[in-house]
Amino acid sequence: MQMQNSQIQGLGHADLVQAPDDSWWMICLGYRTSGYLQHVMGRETMLAPVEWAKGGWPVVNGNGTLETDMPCNTLPLVPMAQDPEREEFDFIKRNAHADSYHALGLPMGWMSLCNPDYSNYSLTERKGFLRLRPSTTDLSETASPTFVARRQTELNFSATALLDLSQLIEGMQAGITAYAAPLNHYDVVVECRNGKLFAKSVVRLGQTSHSEKELPLSGNKAYLRITSDKDFYYMQASSDGTHFTTLAKMEYRFLSTETIGGFTGVMLGLFTQSEVQTDGYVDVDWFEYRTTIQP
């Protein structure tokens, strides 16, 4: 009963491990909740200190509970490679191989949906850019749209992308999304109509799709952003990267496991789609993901 109001929930699949210094630890799965005791980040691997006296029972964290912060003696720290905050889509800088999707030069944390059509993705046609060609499959179908994304890892974050839309033609859409499932995602979408670009919010909840506000864009570039403050996702757009307009805000709980099921959590990514086959495309200059860890 001590855990019922804890931010950490859904614990299971635990293993007890003894470290080289004879200290004991528990590795398990669990998820972090927020205001509504719901979670959007899927099940994560967690580590907790264990006291195990000879002849006694193991006790986790002194009282049998897990917290986001648990004071304890730690093992020697080992530096780990970190993904850059800003992905600039230059596989040459990383000496990565570009023959297959998983080695496009993106960190291994990037992913697509189902079996991607590799011809819709390129890092070589324009150096330093990720070129996305639209699919006639859209985000709300159970198939493989043109889509690349990474996991949401904190409740407080900002995800921003700079898109070159000079080859976005009418009938196409491109954007950034907080994606939980085909019928549950929050998007910032750019469309071209009569030669002009417009950004809008699209909220997909089950069989309902809703757009609240539209923003005319100047020029052929757009800065698209989704942020979260633990309770809401905010969908934003800008022509200059400095002055952002909030197009909509939606509660994060509508993308949570408790609302829609599943256990893998929200992805933050880029997509393009079209009503018909087209020669248009979108070039992504960079994608930036910044997080703030808060208690």
Predicted segments, located by residue:
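Carbohydrate-active catalytic/glycan-binding domains of CAZyme proteins
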Residues: 1-295
